[in-house]
Amino acid sequence: MAEKRDYYEVLEVTKESTVEEIKKAYRKKAIQYHPDKNPGDKEAEEKFKEAAEAYDVLSNPDKRARYDQFGHAGMSGAAGNGGPFGGFSGGMSMDDIFSMFGDIFGGHSGGGFGGGFGGFGGFGGGGSQQRKFRGSDLRVKVKLNLKEISTGVEKKFKLKKYVPCSHCHGTGAEGNSGSETCPTCKGSGSVIRNQQTILGTMQTRTTCPTCNGEGKIIKDKCKVCGGEGIEYGEEVVTVKIPAGVAEGMQLSMGGKGNAGKHNGIPGDLLILVEEEPHPELIRDENDLVYNLLLSFPTAAIGGAVEIPTIDGKVKVKIEAGTQPGKVLRLRGKGLPSVNGYGTGDLLVNVSVYVPETLSKEEKSTLEKLEESKNFKPSTSIKEKIFKKFRSLFD
């Protein structure tokens, strides 16, 4: 499958573009690739859906912030791979797109741009504003340890949610009674109201109060769901968490939220990532940090020590004369980037342990060593340490 394009590139806007500029850019793309203008052109249809997906993210402040920070992985859980978070366009019909972006298409419901598109009309008539109900989003939390974050992991969730009614299959109607065209709006989902003003008669189009914008009414309502088309149930969902996710990151799994009334558009499942603290390692973005406490003899004469990593312990050589504050870098032993670009390092911060109590023999030995010039810091060492200390205040 082709890799997803950058959403800003799709709409030909920049990260500094305002919501209004993004809306204008999307409107331009929607007109260019609209199915009515490009009948039978599959490539144009895909570009139309691609533009709609980009607009869905960039026009929403929360989604846009996640996308700016994490890229496609923040929206799809597996950057551009069409996985379980494959974005809304993969499972959305053209009618769904028109329904979600009614303010752009002037209430289109599948039969051309319609008269409500203002100065962008002319691709068919209708002015229909039939509405599809969208289910609400569901939110869950997932707690991950560093090992799971480093490799990616699948998690199963047992969700209590609204699902299509098992009796009426989501229609809301009892048996085969079905639905009837709304007598108020004649199926358009909207009504035009005339209002007298000092400038003359003003016409406004509003949602039909009888059918609530659906364009149809149910005479014989389902006995199980009461005509809503949904009931409370359960669903087990498997979520593939990508490697490199971070605390506070929110993933979105399209279409796995609450079902929409009357076979409407389902909401999304939003997964908030929480990170379990590691007993020895601290995370710093994609790097991991470990505080190594060396004994004085090992720091002085050198040796080998074991360092914990995500994949187990590794032996690291300690050079003779290793100073406190030195940082050893184990490349590639950190966490992968959630966007798939590179892996962090494991930074080993060296500290030297000074014993609090000594035996007589140990104290005597150290007193003898104290007289040695090698145990007295030279002027150059003092200057080096002072420069490092002063840099903390620059």
Curated annotation (Swiss-Prot):
Protein name: Chaperone protein DnaJ
CXXCXGXG motif repeat feature ranges: 165-172, 182-189, 208-215, 222-229
Highest taxon above the source species: Bacteria
One GO location term (cellular component): cytoplasm
Residue stretches making up the J domain: 6-71
Main localization category: cytoplasm
CR-type Zn finger ranges: 152-234
Domain notes: The J domain is necessary and sufficient to stimulate DnaK ATPase activity. Zinc center 1 plays an important role in the autonomous, DnaK-independent chaperone activity of DnaJ. Zinc center 2 is essential for interaction with DnaK and for DnaJ activity.
Subunit structure, as described in the record: Homodimer.
Gene from which the chain derives: dnaJ
UniProt cofactor note: Binds 2 Zn(2+) ions per monomer.
Cofactors (names): Zn(2+)
Keyword terms, alphabetized: Chaperone, Cytoplasm, DNA replication, Metal-binding, Repeat, Stress response, Zinc, Zinc-finger
Protein family membership: Belongs to the DnaJ family.
Signal peptide as annotated in the record: none
One GO-annotated biological process of the protein: protein refolding
